[in-house]
Amino acid sequence: MKAAEGVTVVYVADTRKAMEDMVPFFFDYPSRKMRMIALTGTNGKTTTTHVVSHILEQAGYKTGVIGTIHALIGDKELPTHNTTPDVIDLERLLWQMAEEKVTHVCMEVSSHSLVMGRVEGVEFDNAVFTNLTEDHLDYHKTMDNYAKAKAILFEKVSSAGQTKGNKAAWVNVDDPYAHVMMDAVDQKVADLHTYSMSDKTADLYAFDSRFTGKSSAFKVIYEGKTYQFETRLAGRFNIYNTLGAIGAALSEGISMETIAAAMKTFHSVPGRFELIDEGQSFTVVVDYAHTPDGLEKILTTAQEITKGRILVVFGCGGDRDKMKRPIMGRIAARYADVAIVTSDNPRTEDPETIVKEVAAGVEEVKAEKPSLQVEVVVDRRSAIQKAISLAKGDDIVLIAGKGHEDYQILKDKTIHFDDREEARKALKESCAARF
């Protein structure tokens, strides 16, 4: 390659690696000017990120949020296209946050971004591991590879030669892959902490949990003292999310009393066990659960809070891990009374083929559970309408898979589609039909 006259050309072995080094330099290393809190795990990243941000704001700090739903600077919302933006967009966003005097950034960090080096130039101060369950195996191939990818974050937060002190790592010790994250932490650099709902020796231990359809209450032991927590987040899985957020906040110097008070005023995250209320007698929930573990967690939560039947509307995305399709079918069938299999984001695949692969798992369980009602409705709007029409009294309808998303990706186009909007329309139409 011949350079134009007067233009300096630098030849490198790896252009991506060079960009990872150059871009933070160009933006004057913005992550060094703020406290960087990273949240990683298969499920719970988004909720935990927003809870940490809320706690810090209640403590008087200005926060930035980067994640699946959006990026936030205070209350100002900015669109994002990936859970973790590419290196240029990320560093530009961090620079903007630093310019606007953000003190703490709460950031979801995906396994893809860690492997691909998107966060290579970011100096993290505080890292939280939520859990690791089957997902993204089309990319990572094995769970061990997936775990190693997540562990890169804990190597980063405790790596030598960083510009800031007070490094911390918080790990959900109840997860089978917790040891992978813990082993990655250099405890000479970062403080390693654990949280749990089953291990009393963990640094944060939650117990005596009680649930309603709209809230949770539980106690936490920390440094020998017991604290009472109340939150509007429903379900056992949200106690885990809250514990991770509590840990991160403690490492930022926030008192337990301030954290507990903040949790009372935290509202749900869009599309995360979001209640849809149009005055109906039954409960309707929209949730982003799109992994086997995520689906199982919202279904077990439904069992804890529901006296009536569980109706679940769900599917699997196209051009993604095909192995999880029958698994999710089996999980839905195991916990639900009515399983409605439908389309998610089919992308370039045939929606009917995807639905058949998911339904195969449902049928396996139905052979042993004849009471299970199974409906296959490829059109997602019709599937939601079907669930609403079948529900009554103390039932709960779970609409899983898309959560906050307001689009559906088809083979040749992307259309507007929001589960929450569709649920509200179906509820209003159902109410009108009954009266």
Protein language model features and the residues they cover:
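Short, ordered loop/turn segments at secondary-structure junctions
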Residues: 1-2, 68-69, 111, 132, ...
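Short, active-site-adjacent cap segments at secondary-structure transitions
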Residues: 3, 71-73, 113-115, 176-180, ...
